[in-house]
UniProtKB/Swiss-Prot annotation:
InterPro entries according to UniProt: Thymidate_synth/dCMP_Mease, Thymidate_synth/dCMP_Mease_dom, Thymidate_synth/dCMP_Mease_sf, Thymidylate_synthase
Class of this enzyme: transferase
Protein name according to UniProt: Thymidylate synthase
Enzyme Commission numbers on file: 2.1.1.45
Gene that produces this protein: thyA
Gene3D superfamilies in alphabetical order: Thymidylate synthase/dCMP hydroxymethylase domain (3.30.572.10)
Alphabetical UniProt keywords: Cytoplasm, Methyltransferase, Nucleotide biosynthesis, Transferase
Subcellular location: Cytoplasm
Function: Catalyzes the reductive methylation of 2'-deoxyuridine-5'-monophosphate (dUMP) to 2'-deoxythymidine-5'-monophosphate (dTMP) while utilizing 5,10-methylenetetrahydrofolate (mTHF) as the methyl donor and reductant in the reaction, yielding dihydrofolate (DHF) as a by-product. This enzymatic reaction provides an intracellular de novo source of dTMP, an essential precursor for DNA biosynthesis.
Methyltransferase found in the keyword field: yes
Gene Ontology biological process terms from the UniProt entry: dTMP biosynthetic process; dTTP biosynthetic process; methylation
Oligomeric and partner information: Homodimer.
Pathway note: Pyrimidine metabolism; dTTP biosynthesis
Amino acid sequence: MKQYLDLLKHITETGVAKGDRTGTGTRSVFGYQMRFNLEEGFPLVTTKKLHLKSIVYELLWFLNGDTNNQYLKEHGVRIWDEWATETGDLGPIYGRQWVAWEKPNGDTINQIEEVIQTLKKNPNSRRMLVSAWNPADLPDESMSPQENVKQGRMALATCHAFFQFYVANGKLSCQLYQRSADTFLGVPFNIASYALLTHMIAQQTDLEVGEFVWTGGDVHLYNNTLEQAELQMSRTPYALPKLKIKRKPPSIFDYEFDDFEIEGYESHPHIKAVVSV
């Protein structure tokens, strides 16, 4: 994926040194956009091998409204382990905000369902957004993730904050705004996850896929991933794979892991890096 390699190059060549919450330090740029035509292939990075199982199971977990790490661990996915409490709780993170955003009266809003219904009834609407950024639930940066959860807050502040859908010529496009972007470890997962979600919602609303647009705010490489980024930039991308969805479930909330197949995924070897907590 040339777009992603161009981003790595942009950060390494123009990024500024900044401190951060984790204490690791970053090289950072502010504001960047990548566009992916989903008709041309599924945007899964090929210059290092990605753990596709983690991407799919995490998305299904979000859609289930689940905020406990146990489901992921049962399926061999460990990407949230560092932030969870001893019982697996992560507080009101993405899944809660997506499908059970709490109103002042205690009722909840299923933002995903509302978007799908709007796509079916009024696809020209400019209000087809989902927000996971809820200031009332953000963690206190002076506390550990686990301490925040025990006080009813998110373990980790929302990074991929909100996304919007757009329909033109019978094609569904999605734009994500990611306020904080760990470009080496996180962004490849986020691109694939939201591209997958766009395919799923397109299927549910009888639309074709259009573009996935990724927009980043503080877009950075942690200092402990700079060498890995250089290695990745030295590799030549392979052709993008294709996504096959084997069946159309009754609703967006009924997909299962085995419903998805990635055809023709060829990649360079995995590049190991340590996540900054």
